[in-house]
Regions:
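A short, acidic, amphipathic alpha-helical segment used as a generic capping/interface helix at domain edges
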Residues: 47-55, 84-101
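Alpha-helix N-cap/loop-to-helix initiation residues
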Residues: 2, 115-116
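Active-site catalytic pocket residues across diverse enzymes, especially alpha/beta-hydrolases
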Residues: 20, 100, 127
């Protein structure tokens, strides 16, 4: 999500993984805000999941850092927001948490601690 860096999109990360000795043992942590800032349109969930699957494979996602985005889509800026209070929005997070539950992928919140409890409750509500 920071722009001109290696691994800014998942196809670059897939290329790195495929060059290690045991690529089957390597997975990724997918950050919702970083990916949104890098051009992954979480508000268009189905197409984004298809894009991720085509670039790296959904099975490579081992963990999700759940953060909304203070910045616009494809901004190339790393600015986290609390769930539902940013540009990704609650509808997209409803799809993301349901996907994580279906695939048994853990999620970690990285926003300030004062509101983490509220974020957790919102994610549980969106999931169910």
């Amino acid at each position: 999500g920071a722009g001109k860096i290696i691994g800014d999109d998942l196809s670059e990360i897939a290329e790195i993984i495929n060059k290690v000795n045991h690529p089957a043992l390597v997975g990724i942590c997918l950050d919702t805000q970083h990916s949104f800032a890098s051009g992954y349109a979480w508000r268009d969930f189905e197409n984004t999941i298809k894009k991720i699957d085509a670039e790296i494979g959904l099975e490579k996602i081992k963990l999700i850092h759940a953060n909304d985005s203070l910045t616009e889509f494809n901004s190339k800026k790393d600015r986290h927001a609390h769930i539902g209070q940013g540009q990704i929005g609650p509808e997209a997070f409803q799809n993301i948490v349901k996907f994580a539950k279906e695939k048994n992928i853990d999620m970690i919140l990285e926003t300030e601690h004062e509101k983490v409890k509220e974020d957790i409750e919102l994610l549980k509500k969106l999931r169910d």
